Amino acid sequence: MITYHKEMVQGSEEWLSARCGLLTASEMHLIVTPTLKAASNEKERAHLYELLAQRITSYVPPRYVGDDMLRGMEDEVLALDLYAKTYSKIDRVGFITNDKWGFTIGYSPDALIGDNGQVECKSRAPKYQAQTLTEFVPVKKIDPDFVIQVQTGLLVTERDWCDLVSYCGGMPMAT
């Protein structure tokens, strides 16, 4: 069953608590390879142990918030505002879970669109936005670094499509 936590604010204590011990779309790349095979490496094992520890203790250790993360939090607001003005009305949601497989996977989309769409925003450093605009946009491809997260988000929400928004202040937005 899909559960929407619409009032939850991403990054809040409530949001961290809801994600505690759950596999989420943003972390799926740690257990699935870009070729969609199950990972079997130190990162995968470390992540599974981290989730296990969270389930046992009901505690999520604090994470370092660096300059890139701070920029991302600010850029996400700007990107969503620009997206809404350019493309479509958006509805914000904090967290979505789906447990139809006998276990729960979580996803924090940046916005939902109507009944069938969602938006995932990425704040990019200028050099990566330049790469996105020159390598991926002309051929209508998604940066491989984000494919697993977008696909998992669609799996969790059971929606039909996702606009991946790549944003860097001062440069064109890519969708």
Please describe what each predicted stretch is.
Residues 86-109, 113-175:
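Nucleic-acid nuclease catalytic cores
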Residues 1-74, 78, 137-140:
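Charged, glycine-rich intrinsically disordered N-terminal tails and low-complexity linkers that flank
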Residues 50, 78-81, 148-151:
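Short, contiguous clusters of charged residues that form electrostatic/catalytic patches at enzyme active sites
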Residues 63, 67-95, 104:
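Short, well-structured hydrophobic secondary-structure segments
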